[in-house]
Amino acid sequence: MPIKIPDSLPAKEVLTNENIFVMDEHRALHQDVRPLRIAILNLMPTKITTETQLLRLIGNTPIQVEIELLHPKTHVSKNTPEEHLTKFYKTFDEVKDEKFDGLIITGAPVEQMEFEEVNYWEELKKIMDWSVHNVYSTFHICWGAQAALYHHYGIKKYPLKEKMFGIFPHRICKPNTMLLRGFDDCFYAPHSRHTEVRREDIEKVGEIDILSDSEEAGVYIMKTRGGRQVFVTGHSEYDQFTLKEEYERDLAKGLKIKMPKNYFPDDDPTKPPVVNWRGHANLLFSNWLNYYVYQETPFDLNELK
């Protein structure tokens, strides 16, 4: 989708160089269409990297998308310049009276903390409650998915004996689901987390379909029966070197971290990783935008309930 973003956003130059269709504000205003309004609540510390990864995935198809970047007001970012946040981001208070076709809630490196210990938890709960009636479909990623499952359905997360870290094969659990349209029977996705949600807890709820899982990485993609909420426990948005950067960061901190599985050729960290998840990452986001947002959301967002 051609994405409408500010002309000076750092992601614009990166995506333009990759031939992703980025539309400037002037051109967008002269197209006689209603763009999809997609908000991204960016909880990741490396906000510029994350916004670029997500914009890459929701760009370059025929529907115009207008992006609103959000960050939690109750958290001070240590890794993103305040100038960037002031220029390109809004807080929930600034958009709470608006409605959106879609919302993406990213992951965050806080999954080893109890939800209630996260300093922006109360604000996040308000945003998740607001999303039920002010957003047509919400796409939750990794810790964002765990947070939503816990808040909306009381589904707990459990600590893992060691970090789930690497690229893992997945299977389709529910065939003929539009969210997975075009997916291969076996496909790959990155995971990077210290906790998990369990199938038996999800199945007890009765309102959530498990669409995909992995023998090693566990439950991967879920959605509510109407598709208004999507939960993804991995990081399909990650680019080629994200896991490498996380691995090197943890090594530099002196943490006990194993090499990401199925990532470096021959398990040799000097060799560049081969990306085998990009196609399905693009399918996942384009299917969500097409079948669960564009084809379902009301033309007049004021009719959203």
Swiss-Prot record:
GO terms for cellular component: cytoplasm. One of its GO terms (molecular function) is homoserine O-acetyltransferase activity. Its EC number is 2.3.1.31. It is found in: Cytoplasm. InterPro entries: Class_I_gatase-like, HST_MetA, MetA_family. Pathway: Amino-acid biosynthesis; L-methionine biosynthesis via de novo pathway; O-acetyl-L-homoserine from L-homoserine: step 1/1. Coiled coil: none annotated. GO terms for biological process: L-methionine biosynthetic process from homoserine via O-succinyl-L-homoserine and cystathionine. The record marks S192 as: Important for substrate specificity. The keyword Cytoplasm applies. The active site is at C142 (acyl-thioester intermediate), H235 (proton acceptor), E237. Substrate binds at K163, S192, R249. It catalyses: L-homoserine + acetyl-CoA = O-acetyl-L-homoserine + CoA. The record marks E111 as: Important for acyl-CoA specificity. Keywords: Acyltransferase, Amino-acid biosynthesis, Cytoplasm, Methionine biosynthesis, Transferase. PANTHER family: HOMOSERINE O-SUCCINYLTRANSFERASE. Transfers an acetyl group from acetyl-CoA to L-homoserine, forming acetyl-L-homoserine. Belongs to the MetA family. This is Homoserine O-acetyltransferase. It comes from Acetivibrio thermocellus (strain ATCC 27405 / DSM 1237 / JCM 9322 / NBRC 103400 / NCIMB 10682 / NRRL B-4536 / VPI 7372) (Clostridium thermocellum). The lineage of its organism: Bacteria, Bacillati, Bacillota, Clostridia, Eubacteriales. The gene is metAA.
